[in-house]
Amino acid sequence: MSNSLIFKSQMAQLNTVLIEERNLEVLYEQLTEKLAKAPEGFFKGAAMVAHLKAVDNVDLSWLMHLKTVFQKHHLLLVGVTQHPFDSETLFRAGLIDVPFLEPKSAKLEGEEEIKSVDLNEEIESSSPHFLSGAAHRKTLTVRHHVRSGQRIYAHGGDLVVIGTVNAGAEILADGNIHVLGTLRGKAFAGIKNNEDAHIFCLEMAAEIISIAGIYQNLEKNAHTTKNNCLITLNSDETMQITPL
């Protein structure tokens, strides 16, 4: 008999959502509000993990209704982390137990920072200390092309990509983004409400660009500037693309 079924261990790209509300009706409204701040379709169909450390007195029925809340937002809840449930309860709910890993403070130069993104961290403003100055920022340098389907997030600092960011790829940074190549995918700078952040690329062909949650869909809104582009956010929340 031929062996046509092979099990392999592989890290999948999962997004983490910190759940701090037990009332699912309130949670539904909160999720609606947060998704409205993200570019249209940014999380549609995304696999999600619920972080449940802050929630207590919940049971299997609550878990099943939680899955429904995600489904109504076109999100797929596949697992939970930091939760009180046993393996039998998770099996009946159709969820997996996802080990909780503390975010790493730094990565070796050239490595990708993370493959999972916290929804709250990504689209909600953060504490004021982030804006205290660039001296405390770290820089994540990626020395290769970013392929379609990849997502790279520079947590707590700037992102430099030495290569092309292909269509379908997403790059995110708490600070600035520099692409020393062609930017074809989606770029989100200053995602913790840093309005002073900027995006620079040698060639602009992006799908979406965003600074501090303000974004432009460049597939729908044509622009003429193509080379050596610096993108900044104006005080009236419009974007300025300047050739250097």
From Swiss-Prot:
GO terms for biological process: cell morphogenesis; division septum assembly; regulation of cell division; regulation of cell septum assembly. This is Probable septum site-determining protein MinC. The keyword Nucleotide-binding does not apply. Coiled coil: none annotated. HAMAP family: MinC. Transmembrane segments: none annotated. The keyword Cell division applies. InterPro entries: CAP/MinC_C, MinC, MinC_C_sf, MinC_N, Septum_form_inhib_MinC_C. PANTHER family: SEPTUM SITE-DETERMINING PROTEIN MINC. It comes from the Bacteria. Pfam families: MinC_C (PF03775), MinC_N (PF05209). Interacts with MinD and FtsZ. Cell division inhibitor that blocks the formation of polar Z ring septums. Rapidly oscillates between the poles of the cell to destabilize FtsZ filaments that have formed before they mature into polar Z rings. Prevents FtsZ polymerization. Belongs to the MinC family. The gene is minC. Keywords: Cell cycle, Cell division, Septation.
